[in-house]
Amino acid sequence: MILLPCYIFGAQSVLIDSLTIFIFEQVNMKKEYPVKHLGAAQIPSSLPISSSSRYEDFKFVNDDNCILHDVAVSSINEEQAPHSFEQAGPRALSYFDSSKVRAGIVTCGGLCPGINNVIRTIVMQLHHNYGVQRIHGFRYGFQGFIPSYQHDIMDMTPENVRNIHNLGGSILSSSRGPQDPVEIVDCLERNNIRILFCIGGDGTLRGAHGIAEEVDRRNENMSIIGIPKTIDNDIPYCVKTFGFETAFSKAVEAVQAAHSEAYGYNYGVVIIKLMGRNSGFIAANTSLACPDVNFVLIPEVPFTMEGEKGLLHSLESGFEAKKEQGRHPHSVIVVAEGAGQNLLGNNSNERDASGNIRFKDIGAFLKENIQQYFKDRYPVNIKLIEPSYMIRSLPANPHDAIFCYYLADHAVHAAMAGKTDMMVGYWNGHFTHVPLEVVIKDQKRINPHGEFWRQVLFSSGQPGDMYSPK
């Protein structure tokens, strides 16, 4: 594979699977960012796995095992080893004594299908496979560590998590916003917790890295493991995040209903606003799965409303083309919440609890401008649908449930082996260990010059360029 030049963040575009090309900096994880380890693991693993098994899937994983960054390259430099990740999986030796160690779990940020699946698997794996008896859940995100909030700490047992995978949301609840790593580590020390699993998105992973740094400053032996969670699917070095498939599958149902609504009127227009602050994966995947969509607007691809190439003229041209073909003039527009913010004059420094810039409502903006433009042209009937919060509060679908199990399973193996300051990633069909230091440097975004976006354009039929400079 030839690495294409990148047009966002000055990085490189990297092939991850057969369809999607993401954009972020390419680095050699194993060489430049080795996974941190608390020390030598010396306790034989209690897992029923043999180092000498002739079946590869039933062997312990060695720290030297690598997952290649690229499955295809244009050439190989003999003097430079291929870029790779450390492979996830059970190790033959454990760092922590399972009869003594205590573990904690926290969920932060927005809800996402599959959180409870991850919690359940962590508890079950720690208890049944490693024999860890004391597992605690911290409620309401990082607030749960701070005494002033007075949140109770939950005892997590196999019995009280047995059926939680059938529920949406998080049994630990959540909150947004950072907390002082010093206070968090103080809480961990007070409760003698040596392993902490942080389930969350980019803000949570930044927080987890801050906790790991504070632990390191104190020279404490604590394992801090991140598990990526976001329906925006924008965590780098992870092909997909859990819950994403469930979320966009539900969004497809909304688009199908929207198409029926648009088709029910002459010049019917329905706008579906979906989540996606800086990355348009939900909008793009939903549109590709539902080819009734005519326009897909994402943060990675700028567009204008006015001008010959603008959205309004393109929408009008679509109406005229359908009339000429004897077809019913209507249109379905899918837009990510972070798209077109430059058109709304969003130069505000106002931020939410997570530190994200507060976006203005692109859905309402599109509706108002389309109504105004067609007022004296066509009798458009326009509606705005926002299924955002409905699609993220569902239980995980079967495929996501399996993915959650694998993520949590590998997180437990990493923690018991003494790994720390790392995230469990998923790359080229394998689970990996990715240092948080590099994860928090970037976001995964759609490459507007890549195969995936080209397929979205072909499916929707929208122009490849809807930007008219003034």
Task: For each feature predicted by the language model, list its residue ranges.
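Glycine-rich oxoanion-binding loops at beta->alpha junctions
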Residues: 63-96, 144-194, 231, 242-249, ...
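Glycine/threonine-rich beta-strand-loop-alpha-helix active-site module
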Residues: 124-151, 209, 215-258
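N-terminal phosphate-binding or glycine-rich loops at protein starts, especially the Walker A/P-loop
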Residues: 29-45, 96-146
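Short glycine-rich or small-residue beta-strand-to-loop segments that form or flank ligand, phosphate
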Residues: 102-112, 170-173, 194-200, 226, ...
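Accessory alpha-helical/coil subdomains and C-terminal extensions
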Residues: 187, 198-200, 206-221, 241-380
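Short glycine/serine/threonine-rich phosphate/pyrophosphate-binding segments
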Residues: 112-122, 145-146, 180-184, 202-210, ...
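C-terminal non-catalytic interaction/assembly regions of soluble proteins
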Residues: 27-55, 348-470
